[in-house]
Amino acid sequence: MLSLVIPVYKNEENLPRLFRELEQVAGRLADELEIVFVVDGSPDASLRILREHLATWPLRAQLVELSRNFGSFAAIAAGLRCARGEFMAVIAADLQEPPELILEFHRVLKAGDADIVFGYRTGRADPWWSRWLSESFWRLYRRFVVRDMPKGGIDIFGCTQAVRDRVLDLKEINTNLIALLFWLGFRRAFIPYERRARLEGRSAWTVGRKFRYALDSIFNFTDLPIRMLLLLGVGGTGFAVIAGLTVLIGWSTGHVPVLGYTPIMLVITFFGGLTALGLGIIGQYLWLSLQNARNRPAFIVKSAETFEPHSAGCRSASASTRNSS
């Protein structure tokens, strides 16, 4: 069985089309399909729409409700924990990634050709500024952090049950799930696709969320900011020593007049800003260390329901007050 995990946040307008496309994919899949919807504290009517539709849906499904919004990667982890299939796959509810990719994921995993299958973007129907920011970020991320990362970046993947178990063994929070999968190793396969335009609703992936995601992706997987700060500090100190000696020698020989307070203030301002930057970088690492040391769960499941095919209602429902990835 293939378990398909779909995090849901502000997707009520996309759900009717999502149901139709999933039914089409299920008809073409050479295996049983289970859909795990994870409502990540969505403030709209997504939970109600899902519960009503799944009660009479011809596909096997689970509906997991988190106690609040924990973020898409925490929601994915919650769905992976609840999934019962031999193989897993993850897509977004906005349908910008074509659900047909699930068929390719399943084919590769079923054949045993790989343990993890990534779908990577070869193009995207997004505004130019969004494309530019995304391409710039992934280019730098590939250069300095995860060198195996495809140029277009990755949002969706499929994996075996063994990989899922190893992912859930990791207790990191505020992290990048895709980078964790690369860190784990295992055999990988890559399938290209063209990212589609969003047809309904507005993306909840705001600039602020993207910025936070970028910081988590960097600080959790590289010490590059610390090393850059060290190089800046060494270079700045060396420059200050050389400049100071040059001015001192020139002043003592009468070739350089005393210039007043302006150069001193500029140097103080420069190194003061550098110090503040360094404290911010170190503080970010300390904050991430504190978050992980607290050992809080990455998510909390408020309720979980199971819907069997052609059922008049849900077969079982259960609630959990503590669940973590």
What residues fall within each predicted segment?
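Structured catalytic core of nucleotide-sugar glycosyltransferases
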Residues: 1-126, 318
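Residues in soluble alpha-helical coiled-coils and helical-bundle/repeat scaffolds
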Residues: 9-13, 96, 100, 168, ...
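Acceptor/aglycone-binding surface of glycosyltransferases and processive sugar-polymer synthases
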Residues: 64-68, 72-82, 99-180, 196-215
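Transmembrane helix-loop junction
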Residues: 52, 143, 166, 220, ...
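Hydrophobic helical membrane-anchoring modules
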Residues: 176-325
